[in-house]
């Protein structure tokens, strides 16, 4: 919570004393999914927002997860079992605060998002703890091309706007991304980016794609890289264990993503793409649709 308080203080210092008022409610929703060797994780997320003025917005939401597990063995302290099947449930309720400035020189937004542990920890939908993520994004438009960059600090590795991760984590991390978007036509664009996640200290990983045993012994945590699961990469502990504590180097990640998007109107968008994690030696395809009405 000290991290969250510090973030709120910094945001308070950078807010302008006055801003042109443009208040109003908004409602948005999205449905997206990511598929890889561990299974398919999909998420639908309704969000209610309120614009205080042109620069400051708050929002609340609640995600719902749908997970199709692949038929791979899991290794924990209990005997291995098949992880094939389907699971669903709510994730962590969240509240966000966003400050943004748009001008000819630079577009900037700073977002603080807090989550409450309302999701099922045993299914990997929650860490069982309150989390905070402070992200800062910069972009500038050059005709049809818009480069962008982002940097943030959090105590969890969050899903991105287009990528639903196969795990939830608890531990201090920094996250970074840089890339660009090119407008092919008025409503069609292609994008690419490189990303990195740098962890600090031990990280607890909760898998969304490995079933937890119902027996008492199965709830014990494992040790990374000691199983005989589907993955040959010892870093992919989320494919072999439902919950485990790992050192920072296991949670570190870097890779590239590419996607295209279609926005027939300002209220509707669709995207699909591919992400390659170099650290995890992991390929993922993803998709998403979304809508937005109001301010």
Task: Label each region the model flagged.
Residues 32-34, 78-84, 119-124, 161-167, ...:
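Extracellular loop and loop/strand-boundary signature of outer-membrane beta-barrel proteins
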Residues 46-50, 60, 95-99, 112, ...:
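Residues on the lipid-exposed face of transmembrane beta-strands in outer-membrane beta-barrel proteins
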Residues 38-45, 70-77, 110, 120-128, ...:
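Outer-membrane beta-barrel translocator domains and adjoining extracellular loop/strand segments
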Residues 18-52, 57-59, 65:
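Short glycine/proline- and aromatic-enriched beta-strand/turn motifs that initiate or cap beta-hairpins
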């Amino acid at each position: 919570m000290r991290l969250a308080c510090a973030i709120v203080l910094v945001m308070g210092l950078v807010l302008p004393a006055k801003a042109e008022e443009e208040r109003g409610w908004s409602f948005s929703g999205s449905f997206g999914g990511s598929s890889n060797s561990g299974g398919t994780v999909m998420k639908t997320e309704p969000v209610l927002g309120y614009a205080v003025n042109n620069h400051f917005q708050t929002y609340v939401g609640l995600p719902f997860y749908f997970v199709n597990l692949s038929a791979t063995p899991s290794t924990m302290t209990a005997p291995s079992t098949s992880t094939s099947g389907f699971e669903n449930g709510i994730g962590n309720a969240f509240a966000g605060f966003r400050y943004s400035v748009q001008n000819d020189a630079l577009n900037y937004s700073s977002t603080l998002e807090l989550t409450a542990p309302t999701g099922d920890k045993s299914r990997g939908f929650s860490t069982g703890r309150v989390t905070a993520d402070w992200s800062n994004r910069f972009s500038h438009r050059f005709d049809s091309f818009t480069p962008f960059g982002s940097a943030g600090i959090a105590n969890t590795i969050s899903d991105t706007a287009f990528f639903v991760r196969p795990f939830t984590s608890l531990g201090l991390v920094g996250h970074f991304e840089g890339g660009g978007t090119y407008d092919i036509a008025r409503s069609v664009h292609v994008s690419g980016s490189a990303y990195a996640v740098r962890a600090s200290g031990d990280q607890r990983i909760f898998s969304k794609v490995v079933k937890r045993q119902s027996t008492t012994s199965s709830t014990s945590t494992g040790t990374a890289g000691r199983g005989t699961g589907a993955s040959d990469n010892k870093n992919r502990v989320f494919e072999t264990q439902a919950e485990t504590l790992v050192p920072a180097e296991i949670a570190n990640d870097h890779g590239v993503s590419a996607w295209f998007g279609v926005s027939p109107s300002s209220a509707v968008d669709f995207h699909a793409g591919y992400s390659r994690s170099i650290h995890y030696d992991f390929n993922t395809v993803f998709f998403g649709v979304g809508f937005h009405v109001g301010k």
